[in-house]
Amino acid sequence: MPNSQKICIIGSGLTALTIAYLLSKFNLQIDIVEQDLKKKKIKPTKLALSKHSFDQLCSYGLKDIKKKSNVVKNIYLHDSYSSISLKKDLEFSAPNTKEALAYIIDGNILFSDISKKIKSFKNINFVKKEISSINDNKFYKEIIFKDLTKENYNLVIFASANNLFLLSKFKLRKVIDKLYNEDAYVFNLHHKKIINNSARQFFLKDGPLAFLPVSRTETSVIWSIKNN
């Protein structure tokens, strides 16, 4: 039986679709609102999911992602402020060899799998409209679209990096805006087949450098470098 609660999710990227997918299991009526609903181009980013988050997605019907991901069994942290050193300063390991600390998966693969699932859900509706204003009433949130149509929602979730100007339409009690003054460089390295189940992070003078094991033949490198 459908739930009478109605949810609006602004955005149609991976974060928005994941939220919609998980909430759909409660039979909520969900509108995914985005002015441009063309095929999303997800950046070639590899995602690290905690074991708990990964298990949750699998339990909600995304079991196929298990064979499309790589297990992380060890995480090594290196205090290499002056130069890269393989001396391990801190190590995290799974309780036993059969368990995982985390999983690495391609963002595009996860996005595609969730998109396919969502298309078959009758309680999720895609709305291709531009939002004009968001009004906070006592019992609901009213969204007015540019075509002057209105919709009332019990909850509005903002999950869009493309419509940041809409944040000003939310009456937020507190907004935290932090500038890190860093640029992140991502490299996907393809190499010969190895046992690749360990993640490493080096804390360098110019910023942290991380190695994520994507598969036995691929490693993702992320280097966050200070702008100065």
For each feature predicted by the language model, list its residue ranges:
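Conserved FAD-binding catalytic core of PHBH/FMO-like flavoproteins
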Residues: 159-228
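Conserved N-terminal helical subregion
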Residues: 70-169, 178-182
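N-terminal Rossmann-fold NAD(P) dinucleotide-binding loop
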Residues: 16-17
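N-terminal FAD cofactor-binding segment of flavoenzymes
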Residues: 43-80
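Rossmann-fold NAD(P)-dependent oxidoreductase module
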Residues: 22, 117, 188
